[in-house]
Amino acid sequence: MDKSGSNPQVDAFIAAVDELLPGFLADPIDMAMQDGNCSLMIIEENGRVYGRMFGTDHVKQRGTCRIAWQKCTQVWMTGFATGKFEELVFSNQLDPSPFGIPHPDFIGWPGGLPGRLQDGTKLALAFSGMRGENDCEILRRAAAQVPGMSIE
């Protein structure tokens, strides 16, 4: 994989999210969350960051981008889906100290998932702007459209 340029699988994933988003936003509940202003973030294990903001309201885009960044960096640092990490920590099944994230900074909401490319590259994926379950679902559906990409 060319580390200096774009990653074709990640580009295909972003395109799949773009294609799927109107179907999700057809639900009035998800549309009302941020008026269709959503953000996608992807981080490769080496720290390369990809992303896309959707919509027209820069203030709302900035807000969803901040949440997507927080979800994505938490997955990147921990390897666990958002929500699952907190569940493990708060049930005393996982010591959070090796990850370096203070408890007040845990995101706690669904929408961040670990992924992997066929070549073994680990990814942190996050979406923000809809209900948390749909933030996750759009990531799952988009990954299913990209050959060699999986959600862990």
Regions found by a protein language model. Name each.
Residues 1-117, 121-151:
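Flexible, solvent-exposed loop/hinge segments and secondary-structure transition points
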